[in-house]
Amino acid sequence: EDEADPNSKNDFGMNIIPALLRDGRKMYAYHFNGYWRDVGTIDSLWEANMEVLDPENSGIDIFDEKWKIYSRNPVLPAQKIGPRAVVQDSLVTEGCQIYGCVKHSVLSAGVVVEEGATVEDAVLMDGVVVKAGAVVKRCILAENVVVGAGAKVGGDGPIAHVGTGLTIGAGATVKEGAKVFDSVKEGEEV
């Protein structure tokens, strides 16, 4: 029902649970001692991904054998790390090709970071391509985004977000904190 409501943000705390209460439906609580984070915003999704990179302070150890991860990863070849690539404190999934610099970031399946490109404190979803000389910092790039050569996305401030399937043209700039839902032309600043 909530999914069909165009006015709903499809949020458990804001929409779904209050609607169940209004309808007089039975609900039960469960005391959960493990890690949980509401990732209903772009910023909270970014924060949760950064916490995975810091198991000592977050308590999240994805390599703990007792903590099962159930997923359906695509069948892709192993990661390719180029001869001049730098990868530090990051999670890199299958099919990624890294020839540039990746620091403190989470890269989903099939991401390509070309030589001379820099990715830092970022979450890159499936199929993202970061072209040579581009800089991507403190942002989330949705699926199949292409960041053109020499482009800059994000900065040191608030998290930037680029929507699914968009192209950030060569030499373009997406400022920190920007929410981009249309492609950005070559050299343009948003």
Question: Which functions belong to the PLM regions below?
Answer:
Residues 2-190:
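Left-handed beta-helix
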